[in-house]
Amino acid sequence: GWVVLGVVFMALFMFWGAEQLERVFGGRELNREPKMRFIGAGALVGLALVVLAIGQPTVAQRWESIATEKEAALEAREVQLQAGEVLHIMHDHKLKLVLLDVRPEADYNLFHLADALHIPLDEINMLVSDLQLEPANTVFLLMSNDEAGATEAWKALTAQSVPNVYILEGGINEWLRLFACDDTRIQAIEGEVADDQLAFTFEAALGAAYHCAEPDPHQYELEYEERLKLELKRGPTGGGCG
């Protein structure tokens, strides 16, 4: 909105400047010019102000416009990558894997996957412009302790046209169930754990220093359904004027 308004005023200023030059150097009598040009200028400014008032669609509004299609993909488990596929992608040099951990900082400090970036869920939208500049072979993998937080982040990024965004199926808890069973320093919490809460205790906050942060793919034979489908690179979403 502000960009449109600025462009309109810049254009009007240039037209006004051109008229003044013609008046000074060309002897043009502006008082004899049609008054309709003022009406036209006013209409342009009015239109720009309307655009400014309407503003840019919010992330929630953008999501609503695609919710039917994307919710179906979530329900069909098309965007939740299983641990076996993620482990394969980690070692696929044709792809650039960007791991985005949206859990609380305390959980991230206890344990996180190797090279995972800590991005608080309420700050995920600030990252959109940077993510859209990544190469076309980039895969973005969101993770939370289960899937709730990662799903919210996925909706936000998908609504803003960030391509190739996926969710770690089962979250960090499922990852630890698969790869941390031989590490006595990591123990499963007995009983029920609240949704999207860490279901394990750790001897120390070692972050990615635990071996299960980057498992050796040759030590595991995990069956998985291939769900990764690279999208063609798309430009940043405008979401409206402004």
Residue ranges and their predicted role:
Residues K70-L74, A114-L117, V139-N145:
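Second-shell loop/turn segments in exported
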